[in-house]
Amino acid sequence: MTDGIVALGGGHGLYATLSAARRLTPYVTAVVTVADDGGSSGRLRSELDVVPPGDLRMALAALASDSPHGRLWATILQHRFGGSGALAGHPIGNLMLAGLSEVLADPVAALDELGRILGVKGRVLPMCPVALQIEADVSGLEADPRMFRLIRGQVAIATTPGKVRRVRLLPTDPPATRQAVDAIMAADLVVLGPGSWFTSVIPHVLVPGLAAALRATSARRALVLNLVAEPGETAGFSVERHLHVLAQHAPGFTVHDIIIDAERVPSEREREQLRRTATMLQAEVHFADVARPGTPLHDPGKLAAVLDGVCARDVGASEPPVAATQEIPIDGGRPRGDDAWR
């Protein structure tokens, strides 16, 4: 068991990690991507200029207290209005977060207040205090296969029929949320992934403050790989390709452990190749049964057991962290096309 876990991601992948982490400790901090531009989140960020609330709402629901009060409020948070009027498609939680953010003039204060109502013992934090956009270089959309097309927006990137080659954040070098940096520095375990690789996982290492904190923290760092490649973003990607893409976007980024579902890499030959590839992240690879049978989803209980084992085998024995080379700038699972998360 570990005392403090920080999970970075968004959408269904982050929900799975949080559901696993809370089995190990009540003190879980979610650091959530803030680039969603679809569904209810997209409408609210456009109309009210707020941080998109959908993934933040889902993280709060994942960490809500198991008490009757907490479960009731988690259900309320997730309730989505029907009909065809102005509120159609909006979850109550999205509207509450948008309203609290306006009243309190601070998205972190809004999340803390709603977390208090739900009985969350940890925290849910945006990775940046402002809404971001994701921009991608995509190939395969032009007659000349060597040509890239610039695609902007999380939904457009997640659903492109082309091949995503590289992503970047707008604005460039955005500030990290101060409380997220503090949580990473104080954690015992930091978990990145699973999730949409280009729009939920990689954005965290593109925020200078978060990247610096991940290098500087003494926490054990684990990377959880997806169970399957996603249509659109990573269609046709091998497990090895996921690692190469992460390393390409974050030179010098390292983790201690990479967790891969055993069924995804059945042959010893492939596993040995992955172990060699993982050395570029200075990581040890763990092949384990972490899938929910018959689904492309992680099983929270199985994932919790693997994370617990990773911590138990090396508590206090990890390599000293690489010191950050710059001041840390702060404050200034489902496919992302699924509106159920927004």
From Swiss-Prot:
GO terms for biological process: regulation of cell shape. It is found in: Cytoplasm. It holds the Pfam family CofD. InterPro entries: CofD, CofD-like_dom_sf, Gluconeogen_factor. One of its GO terms (molecular function) is LPPG:FO 2-phospho-L-lactate transferase activity. Keywords: Cytoplasm, Phosphoprotein. Phosphorylated by PknA and/or PknB. GO terms for cellular component: cytoplasm. Gene3D superfamilies: CofD-like domains. The keyword Cytoplasm applies. The modification Phosphothreonine is found at T325. Residues 318-342 are annotated as: Disordered. Residues 333-342 have a biased composition (Basic and acidic residues). Required for morphogenesis under gluconeogenic growth conditions. NCBIfam families: CofD_related. Belongs to the gluconeogenesis factor family. HAMAP family: Gluconeogen_factor. This is Putative gluconeogenesis factor. It comes from Mycobacterium tuberculosis (strain ATCC 25618 / H37Rv).
